[in-house]
Amino acid sequence: MVALDTDGRVLLIKAHDPARPEAGSWWELPGGGIERGETSEHACMRELAEEGGVAHAEMGPIIWTQHVTFDFAGWHFDQDEVIHLARVPVGGEELGAQRLEAFEVMAFEDRRWWSVAELLDGGVPTLPPALADLLGPVLTGDVASPPIDI
């Protein structure tokens, strides 16, 4: 999900593939699978708390969709993803404790709030790769309906 704080910064998780450390690290949006009985909104709230340490957010609409295939930690993934917009009603410095799964403990290195300018200026590797460009319209309230397939 795209979790934005009151300053318009996006929460990203720094990760690497523990099966391929030579591939380097990247910054990604928090998220994960939808568990049985969950809606995509409930899954986003759970993942935001687990990965980001954010207890409260206002869930918004699905803004992007994507189909991805990748290998991670020795597993092959082929999945359809929905990406919600979430508004975190506090400044970005207020991150609580994470509740990570075992593979996340091995893969996640850091978490922080990024401005679009920081992402554009620093050549920061992100997933999705065009994240900084995609965020521009979202920050100005230009959220497409139906969602954009990225």
Give, region by region, the residue ranges found by the protein language model.
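N-terminal strand-loop-strand
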Residues: 1-28, 41, 56
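Charged phosphate-binding loop/patch that engages nucleotide di/tri-phosphates or the phosphate backbone
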Residues: 123-150
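A structural microfeature
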Residues: 12, 61-64
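Unchanged
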Residues: 34-58, 66-124
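Short active-site-proximal "capping" loops at secondary-structure junctions
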Residues: 17-19, 64-68
